[in-house]
């Protein structure tokens, strides 16, 4: 009797990707974040779809439509907060996923790594545009401040900003186009995720040792299916606890005030997951320099595979690199804290030191440490 799972053209693809996929036998819980990101994307698309059914992308009614969703729509409040906090969970998983890739040397899968960076940029763009939609104070001023950064581009900057705004300020045209892009981007992200997985399955997964695991593989199902299921339950429990007990913990109180172009909030700041990049942007007094530093802080990830001079792939057996890695994590936490502080001393100085440290660790200390470790191991 033929097995449909292995014969049917569609079932065969699913079978090779999630059931009979040969996976390394020693991958840890750090490898769970890929499937958790898939779950987050699914939650965001489903909740977003239901929100879009009731939301209006007009400056006069956008804020009221969000209030209407929370007050009048059946379980509207839970859908809204699942979507808002789902974005936070998405970024927590994203940062953990990228961190694992850095630690265990997964960036040597160049195609997978590069499409991953493209995915990160797409998710960041989607989250930024989504934050503008409720049309609160922080939505409006965040949109104004961040889109205004493009005016730093020489010659064509100011024209480009007005083109994005669809006028001479952030207004109805801006809100409408942001809603359109925010709606379509998750589907583009889904397509990119499929390409990401396609490239990953060309090489197979990495593992904590960084060594080839062809001699010791196990089927994805049932072993990693059950393992992913545990991660999934933990993530959903965390998300629902956040939504039920403190839904506004990660939000900004200013966004409960309708957008007012005549009144600037005392501190314009983005959501917590952008604060590290925002701190790097603010730490440079020059506008164009700040924009370049902001872009570099993300795009520097693309350089990492080319700066990897170590003979060992993973950091598992490289204590000096491990110390640097955790210094980088601490530095990013400091930058996140600084991004949420007002622009005054000592925060300005701390932000500048942390920004320099960030680039110094990645561009100089890490390659040097890799070479030193090779020497110590007489390689």
Curated annotation (Swiss-Prot):
* Membrane topology listed for this record: Multi-pass membrane protein
Q: Where in the cell is it found?
A: Mitochondrion inner membrane
> What PROSITE patterns does UniProt report for this protein, alphabetically?
CYTB_CTER, CYTB_NTER
Q: Name one GO molecular function term.
A: metal ion binding
Q: Which domain of life is it from?
A: Eukaryota
How is this protein annotated for GO cellular component? mitochondrial inner membrane; respiratory chain complex III
Q: CDD domains per the record?
A: cytochrome_b_C, Cytochrome_b_N
Subunit text: The cytochrome bc1 complex contains 11 subunits: 3 respiratory subunits (MT-CYB, CYC1 and UQCRFS1), 2 core proteins (UQCRC1 and UQCRC2) and 6 low-molecular weight proteins (UQCRH/QCR6, UQCRB/QCR7, UQCRQ/QCR8, UQCR10/QCR9, UQCR11/QCR10 and a cleavage product of UQCRFS1). This cytochrome bc1 complex then forms a dimer.
What is this protein called in UniProt? Cytochrome b
UniProt organism field: Galagoides demidoff (Prince Demidoff's bushbaby)
Lineage of the organism:
Eukaryota, Metazoa, Chordata, Craniata, Vertebrata
- Gene symbol here is MT-CYB
